[in-house]
């Protein structure tokens, strides 16, 4: 009963939207009534479903004032007051419970892209939406918690200790063990098994529970530690395994409603459900769940770590207990053999179905799940056009159905980061793209072609086009326009791409100016449903007469967040708005994708915007 109610409450928390919660709750109430025939259960779930609507509301906007450091991460801090929490990125040496004066704040923003980790969304999941711009220290803490952190940070093997005790991930330990808190949990069971030879089970559990709470108070209550403490409390109050799991799910969802999809919570709960429901081949199902979840969350699996999972878990438990006394060999990372695979929706849906079936009864045929990575190419039926968010630069990827061809237009680089290493290559890898059939470098500017040398080291590139007179080798109409033109500078020499698929016409302008736009109008009778606006939306491009002649529906702009050029210009945005052209910009919307299948097409952005493109 408790497990059913808790899972229903968890579903409400995940849905977030009030209307979705209402619709789900109505259906779930019918299920509960059919199964339990109890009015009390129905009333309890109705109260919880209403409570979930309150829980999922975002916290209040952060304000200037006095904050206290509550979390320490590898490259930043989190500070809180009575109302909210903020991100602190500072060169100041801060410690737990230090008081700071926050003088100014700004929204957290990162260049987010499909399939890649989003630091902005990660913090939003913890109800942290703002970061400090200016701070000063008011009072250094003299608490035991801050002294412990200072002492551990000064140790020779501090990287290992900080990872195990505080969840501050370092490369010395595989991230999965840090996130799941297996250092502490394994240490707990080592101590438990030693003590139960002499003492009563319940007394040991109560003592270790108190110790766990004290540990969290003096160190940090990570998600994994909180979940583990809740489970230990449930063990003392409930005999039924299902009630124990249900209690853990319910109270974790109440305490951390925005983080119920964290791997620190999801994976242990999935494994506990397997342990409770599965009657045969339990070990195989657990391994299947483990490897699937690792692929879904991390998009890679270290085979060595996976095979030695149980052994390493116990090893890190020993390190946790003896961490202050162990030599430096612990900092040596275990050799890795990594398999990379970014599951698409087909795999995730198949995993959910197979997981539910395995809880009932395992069958060997369910292992066909792991053939999907090899079959997903045949599921890719959409024509896809991606505009990546690489800051103040350009990079677009055009993928034909079933990966028949991949064309990239530009691979811009940045002075502040390696765009290829941080964004372009990981995106291609996560989309299972290992070969680029044609790379079009529109012109020789760093923000358009600067990443080429780095990219060719990472990905096989069959053909590179730097001249409009060349041809793109694809089996759909793809033209490089205005081979003969009067160009006054490098920008006006930009290769202009025009292609058609599924009855949609696309025009990519590079950095071409209004003068080139006039030459295009004189040379061609062009119509374009989608235009990649020239020169990042600068007022040197996007002439109103030119845009009007194209009869565009959608405009795509690639520009950096708060860039020094003020791209896109207000003038360009007003022109697009006046012509009723729906405009999407990477600086505000993140990466942008257009999908089409015959006469059906739609556009989505990384920030969650969605729209159907009418033919």
Features from the language model and the residues they span:
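C-terminal regulatory/interaction regions
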Residues: 1-7, 27-29, 320, 328-382, ...
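Active-site-proximal loop/helix segments of hydrolase catalytic cores
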Residues: 258-259, 442, 446, 450-455, ...
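Di-metal (Zn2+ and/or Mg2+/Mn2+) metal-binding site signature of metallo-dependent hydrolases
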Residues: 173-199, 434-457, 533-545
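Membrane-interface helix/helix-cap signal primarily in integral membrane proteins
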Residues: 49-177, 421-429, 435, 469, ...
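N-terminal leader/targeting segments
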Residues: 1-61, 128, 145, 150, ...
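Internal transmembrane alpha-helical bundles of multi-pass membrane proteins
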Residues: 6, 221-366, 512, 518-520, ...
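Aromatic-rich juxtamembrane segments at the membrane interface
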Residues: 125-232, 236, 480, 505-514, ...
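Core dinuclear metal-dependent hydrolase active-site scaffold
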Residues: 361-435, 469-530, 539-541, 588-615
